[in-house]
Amino acid sequence: MSIDFDWSKLDSELEAKVLHLLEGQVSNLSLPSYIKHLKVVDFHFGKVSPQITIQEIGDPDPQFYENEAFELANQELEGDQCSRNNVSPVLTDLPPYAAEHPFSRLAYFNPAFNSPGILSASGLTSPIPESRPSTPMDNHQERDRSNDFQVTAHVSYDGDANLSLEAVLSMNYPNSEFAVLPFKLSFIRISIDAIAVLAKMGKRTHLCFVDTLLHGTGEHASSVIRDLTVESIIGESNKQLLKNVAKVEKFVSEKVKRIIEDELVWPSYITIE
């Protein structure tokens, strides 16, 4: 079943949230010596909407509930006044959700694809566990899950969402930062072809993509992002400019791809509350 929706409803407030998320990720990148002060300066969803075909509507994947249970236990652990040495080993091994970005949740389970629900929708398979592992939530009263649901859909997008970054290119010979040039890079087109999973659980909405490697080739390939169109300008506007510098474009575009995959490709996902 194909659906249409009003892409223009994605307002500036949501764009600001995405921008904030990207800023945090870019600030943590390891940069080569010739690139300094890389930062995100602008993001827009654009006017072209994706094509979405719903494949399945059902219950949320069990791993979402596992993560929810561990997060609840983690919150209780933070409020506990007992010393860490007296805490049960089950709780001391919890993932550090509190240190994560407020719009991001990372699934800390290995192997990554133990959950058959999301994988089966993409045509991949994995063994179904014989029994559901116990979690800290087993000893607590669970919230009402009767209205929880999950939508699995094929998403095809070839649109004008755009992202702009700024940096400084540094010439470090004969001395460090012997010469510096301002640098601006813009992603003006992105092409995505992937399976998307959206799970509505209480007041939270989880979103991720499933990488099936249908289009990927090479060690770091991904089937989610098929293409990125990049433009770059080096220099000051009132002086001679260099445009579309391939080496810098390649480095930054690969880093941006990796950020998107780390945040949005299962077993990682973003959470909106």
From Swiss-Prot:
Residues 124-145 are annotated as: Disordered. One of its GO terms (molecular function) is lipid binding. One of its GO terms (cellular component) is ERMES complex. Residues 1-273 form the SMP-LTD domain. Belongs to the MDM12 family. Component of the ER-mitochondria encounter structure (ERMES) or MDM complex, composed of mmm1, mdm10, mdm12 and mdm34. A mmm1 homodimer associates with one molecule of mdm12 on each side in a pairwise head-to-tail manner, and the SMP-LTD domains of mmm1 and mdm12 generate a continuous hydrophobic tunnel for phospholipid trafficking. Component of the ERMES/MDM complex, which serves as a molecular tether to connect the endoplasmic reticulum (ER) and mitochondria. Components of this complex are involved in the control of mitochondrial shape and protein biogenesis, and function in nonvesicular lipid trafficking between the ER and mitochondria. Mdm12 is required for the interaction of the ER-resident membrane protein mmm1 and the outer mitochondrial membrane-resident beta-barrel protein mdm10. Keywords: Endoplasmic reticulum, Lipid transport, Lipid-binding, Membrane, Mitochondrion, Mitochondrion outer membrane, Transport. InterPro entries: Mdm12, SMP_LBD. It is found in: Mitochondrion outer membrane; Endoplasmic reticulum membrane. It is a peripheral membrane protein. One of its GO terms (biological process) is mitochondrial genome maintenance. The SMP-LTD domain is a barrel-like domain that can bind various types of glycerophospholipids in its interior and mediate their transfer between two adjacent bilayers. This is Mitochondrial distribution and morphology protein 12.
